[in-house]
From Swiss-Prot:
Job description of the protein: Catalyzes the NAD-dependent conversion of D-erythrose 4-phosphate to 4-phosphoerythronate.
Upper lineage: Bacteria, Pseudomonadati, Pseudomonadota, Gammaproteobacteria, Alteromonadales
Cell compartments where the protein resides: Cytoplasm
Pathway listed: Cofactor biosynthesis; pyridoxine 5'-phosphate biosynthesis; pyridoxine 5'-phosphate from D-erythrose 4-phosphate: step 1/5
Active-site residues (renumbered): 155
Cellular-component GO terms for this entry: cytoplasm
EC number: 1.2.1.72
A Gene Ontology molecular function term of the record: NAD binding
Family annotation (CDD domains): GAPDH_C_E4PDH, GAPDH_N_E4PDH
Gene3D superfamilies reported for this sequence: Dihydrodipicolinate Reductase, domain 2, NAD(P)-binding Rossmann-like Domain
Family membership noted in the UniProt record: Belongs to the glyceraldehyde-3-phosphate dehydrogenase family. Epd subfamily.
Chief localization: cytoplasm
Protein name: D-erythrose-4-phosphate dehydrogenase
Length: 371
């Protein structure tokens, strides 16, 4: 089964998703068949092929008659500003990855479904009535396949939750604070310019700029036991990619640096392999560019004060790691849904073979259509 994906919004995350799909050779599992982006097709092709952060695309990229051609695949390029106009029916879309950063409500998800998509995954935090907010590696196994409206949380939530969850299971976290040291983003100007947030009127390359963050709320949504137990602040720094997370937690018993690091190292080699990483190499932020993991612990920076106050430095590629998790979640969800569909089909066939009444048979077929 090859999952048919549409991307709505082809910015940093959308392009990273396409690149990750091809770099990881997952085209047999998933295919991006259509991209909705208001930019000119020539610019779309150019920015797919040439990327200042991740380098040149590893395969030829060509543009022909509004088709983005990569390897043997044709990706349709469309330009619609209204969700109601999107051609998902026409392209038989299984999952829409909405990477606009704009939409996130139940009504927005319903608009995608009405346009013909079976499921919607937002690449950013969504409204509280979302069917599920998923941090892959932590709670993705709670999905049933029935969900239609999902959020992939945020890059920073995906970075922090595996670390917090792991340490809580071993040392019982009481509370914590986080400082996100995030690379500049495209909502910041190159030189001073107008913005509703006065701090973001300032040149991205000239200052460390405090910005708002909802990271604490994101952690609470995945790990409800930590309601009102975490606070977070964020600053943007003059780099183009990779984020550092300064995590401080109070645990319920005295611990040592070695115990903390051993716990995280073990997780990186077992249940969170390829999600959480661990290193003691003398690395800097650029060394984590294009790292597909959600978070990487720098064990040399772990500190313990007064026995139970723990500080950690955690890295993540806020583009590449997150894009890989979106693909992981898409594949997992679509396969769950397909398994349910097949089970429903087998049930109806079995009942037909046993001569079940047409009334019950019709009811089961109606349920199958809903699934």
């Amino acid at each position: 089964m090859s999952i048919r994906i549409a991307i709505n919004g082809y910015g940093r995350i959308g392009r990273s998703v396409v690149r990750a799909l091809y770099e990881n050779n997952r085209q047999d599992e998933m295919k991006v068949v259509v991209i909705n982006e208001l930019a000119e097709p020539s610019a779309i092709a150019h920015l797919t092929q040439y990327d200042s952060t991740h380098g040149r695309f590893p395969f030829p990229v060509n543009l022909q008659n509004n088709l983005l051609k990569i390897k043997n695949d044709d990706i349709h390029l469309v330009r619609f500003s209204e969700l109601a106009d999107l051609p998902w029916h026409e392209h038989d879309i299984d999952i829409v990855l909405d990477c606009t950063g704009i939409y996130g409500s139940r009504a927005d998800a319903d608009a995608h479904i009405a346009a013909g998509a079976k499921k919607v995954i937002f690449s950013h935090p969504a409204d509280p009535d979302v069917d599920a907010t998923v941090v892959y590696g932590i709670n993705h196994q709670q999905l049933t396949g029935d969900e239609t409206f999902i959020s992939g949380a945020s890059c920073t939530t995906n970075c922090m939750v595996p670390v917090i969850d792991t340490l809580d299971k071993h040392f019982a976290i009481k509370c914590g604070t986080i400082t996100t040291i995030h690379s500049a983003m495209n909502d910041q100007p190159v030189i001073d310019a107008y913005h509703s947030d006065l701090r973001r009127t300032r040149a991205a390359s000239q200052s460390i700029i405090p910005v708002d963050t909802k990271l604490a709320a994101g952690i609470e949504r995945i790990l409800p036991k930590f309601a009102n137990k975490f606070e977070a602040i964020a600053v943007r720094v003059p780099t183009i990619n990779v984020t550092a997370m300064d995590l401080s937690i109070t645990v319920s018993k005295d611990v040592t640096i070695q115990e903390i690091n051993d716990c995280l190292l073990k997780a990186s080699e077992t249940n969170l392999k390829d999600i959480l990483g661990y290193t003691e190499a003398p690395l800097v932020s650029i060394d984590f560019n294009h790292d597909p993991r959600s978070c990487i612990i720098d064990g040399t920076q772990t500190r313990v004060s007064d026995g139970n106050l723990v500080k950690l430095l955690v890295w993540c590629d806020n583009e590449w790691g997150f894009a890989n998790r979106l693909l992981d979640t898409s594949f997992y969800l679509a396969n769950l849904a397909e398994q349910k569909r097949l089970q429903s089909t087998e049930t109806v066939k079995s009942l037909e073979d046993t001569g079940i009444s047409n009334e019950i048979k019709d009811e089961l077929q109606d349920r199958r259509k809903i699934i």
